[in-house]
Design a protein with these regions (language model features):
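Conserved beta-strand in the GNAT
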Residues: 5-16, 29, 34
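Conserved GNAT acetyl-CoA-binding A-motif
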Residues: 56-75
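Conserved beta-hairpin
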Residues: 1-11, 180-183
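C-terminal "cap" of GNAT-fold acetyltransferases
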Residues: 95-120
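Conserved acetyl-CoA-binding loop-helix of GNAT-fold acetyltransferases
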Residues: 35, 41-57
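Conserved catalytic-core motifs of GNAT/GCN5-like acyltransferases
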Residues: 67, 84-101, 187-190
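Local sequence-structure signature of Cys/Sec-based thiol-disulfide redox active-site neighborhoods
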Residues: 117-152
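Non-catalytic, surface beta->alpha helical segment in thiol-disulfide oxidoreductase systems
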Residues: 183-204
Length: 204
């Protein structure tokens, strides 16, 4: 634990058990790498990633993979340019612009890939549809508030709480922590506050 105020951690898991719709047997999947507050710019991300790679190699894993994006799509995802700088390559790309990146640790490692449901994210139904898991504590706070705001303003919103690995690995989006759709099309993986959601719905 550092003395500075801020957040600095990495969370990873064998990809076979990851709650995302990817095919990456033998890999380690990075769920989250978060550097915030005064921790930024201190080299902690390099140290955390290096430790993850050391651990993966020590376990005899084929490689490490992570989701990324660029620009405004990057919220709550890793920075593609940073991951490329650290030796990662794009293995697959979803139609919504989210990349699955990987760094092989074994000579015979095949690139991981999205399942078809994640490669072409779409759902049926009108209005908004939200899929989410309990991976991030922000969903616990904001999802009920978005539901309340939608009900108050008569905005159609269907919420699907993913509570098991099988459902997560077959979800209709590359991100399961939070995946918001509108009129069947993927909108964002960024966790919405009630105000942001209402703005997205066109309510002033």
């Amino acid at each position: 634990r550092a003395a500075e105020r801020g957040k600095c951690f990495i969370e990873y898991i064998p990809a076979e058990n990851a709650w995302v719709p990817i095919e990456a047997d033998g890999y380690i999947y990075i769920n989250c790498m978060w550097i915030a507050g005064s921790m930024k710019g201190q080299g902690y991300s390099n140290e955390l990633l290096a430790e993850c790679l050391r651990d993966a190699a020590g376990q005899g894993r084929k490689g490490v993979c992570i989701l990324s994006a660029e620009g405004r799509k990057r919220e709550f995802l890793s920075d593609r340019k940073y991951m490329e700088h650290k030796g990662f390559s794009v293995a697959d790309i979803s139609d919504c612009g989210i990349n699955l990146m990987y760094l092989p640790l074994a000579a015979d490692a095949l690139p991981p890939k999205f399942r078809e449901c994640a490669k072409h994210p779409a759902v049926e139904g009108e209005g908004f549809v939200l899929y989410y898991t309990d991976q991030c504590p922000f969903t616990y706070y904001w999802v009920p508030r978005v539901q309340e705001a939608a009900a108050e303003h008569g905005i159609p919103l269907r919420v699907i709480h993913i509570t098991d690995k099988e459902t997560a690995q077959n979800a209709p989006a590359p991100v399961t922590t939070y995946a918001l759709f509108r009129e069947g099309k993927f909108v964002t993986q960024a966790i919405q506050s009630d105000k942001k959601f209402l703005a997205l719905a066109g309510v002033e």
